[in-house]
């Protein structure tokens, strides 16, 4: 039937048929949002603003910046690592049109060459952790020893942060290497913080391997796909780990 419809001109190509079939099945009311779902309430005015210099790392195509990290050095040879998560739910009334819409979608749909967001653009603009914006978030703080990287304490806060940098993975991944971190030659923004988090991640890896009794599997490969046009141009890019 598909080949017949394409031959008769009812369907331009197989790509269009598959995409439209997916959306008819999963978005029977359409991909758009109602005006009511797009209305964004004001954020609470009494949230404290954290004194951190946070940064995010995403691909250049990412418009919903939903997480960021920070490293703040304390006295006594300690540092505080912050993991900051965007929190549109903080200002989204339970049972509202926006809430019901988000619950029905559950997630943003990602596919090569297309993306259908879980939230309306107005919500993304208000709550995304964009560079230079002061926005609400949920922060997990981990205080660690600078030398041993041992975790000393943890804390969770609801607050506001201003993200200093939105780093783009595809623009810096060739520069961010273990050798550059170890040699102190990394020159990308937040190089010191990236190096500190790398050391922290290595310490956690060593802990996991000790408990497991065997090395963690490495060498796994990630792929990044870029689709141009109507599916005729596909770039497959190997991502480092």
Predicted features and spans:
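Electropositive polyanion-binding surfaces
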Residues: 33-241
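Low-complexity, highly charged intrinsically disordered N-terminal segments
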Residues: 1-53
